[in-house]
């Protein structure tokens, strides 16, 4: 018997394993004055070119151990702690702001990595407890670049610095949350933003969501990971 799967054109494309990643939703204001910190991915990148997104990216080696300048992370499971650090680091790299709290001016802050030096130079601690876990999303299996992304929320009152564009995100600024902005987002971005707004307003219900695709359809499941207390 011949194996039809070996015939030309019948080979299955291997599914790419998703990389752990993180993204940070930063909001300021209320009601009609509610704004979101976001930017547009450059047109030359391979993943989501020209799309408006929150700052974020894949986990780096420096995110896998506690930073010397962090606080409030002792209660977090290791994977969520890594993702929270990545969200803070990527936000600094992509939009130029730090999320944290003032450090004790009399306590020395040793720094070994660029992100640690950034916090140290500004006299800040990276507050992992200033983040709220919003949800998780997994890129569809047909994509050749896949991410297992944890989304977090923080408030503008925890932001130090002024947002600026970078090589990774263009047109970075505070955007009023209106229909024009929402129309420019992917469905997963709109979903996580709506969840973040509900969490901030205290109107969110249900468990932490898992946004994924199965059989070419969008699915919303329950994320079983531990929550970051608000």
List where the protein language model places each region.
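N-terminal leader/linker segments that precede catalytic domains of diphosphate-processing enzymes
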Residues: 1-230
């Amino acid at each position: 018997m011949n194996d039809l799967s070996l015939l030309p054109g019948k080979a299955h494309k291997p599914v790419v394993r998703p990389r752990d990643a993180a993204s940070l939703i930063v909001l300021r204001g209320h009601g009609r004055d509610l704004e979101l910190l976001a930017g547009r991915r450059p047109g030359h990148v391979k993943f989501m070119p020209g799309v408006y997104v929150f700052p974020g990216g894949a986990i780096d080696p420096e995110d896998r151990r506690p930073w010397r300048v962090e606080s409030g992370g002792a209660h977090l499971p290791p994977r969520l702690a890594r993702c929270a650090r990545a969200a803070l680091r990527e936000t600094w790299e992509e939009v130029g702001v730090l999320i944290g709290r003032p450090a004790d001016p009399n306590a020395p802050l040793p720094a070994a990595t660029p992100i640690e030096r950034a916090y140290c130079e500004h006299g800040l601690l990276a507050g992992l407890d200033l983040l709220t876990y919003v949800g998780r999303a997994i890129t569809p299996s047909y994509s050749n670049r896949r991410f297992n992304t944890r989304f977090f929320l923080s408030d503008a009152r925890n932001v130090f610095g002024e947002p600026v564009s970078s090589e990774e995100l263009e047109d970075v600024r505070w955007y009023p949350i209106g229909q024009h902005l929402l129309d420019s987002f992917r469905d997963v971005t709109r979903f996580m933003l709506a969840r973040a707004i509900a969490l901030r307003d205290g109107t969110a219900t249900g468990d932490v969501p898992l946004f994924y695709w199965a059989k070419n359809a969008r699915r919303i499941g329950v994320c079983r990971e531990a929550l970051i207390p608000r």
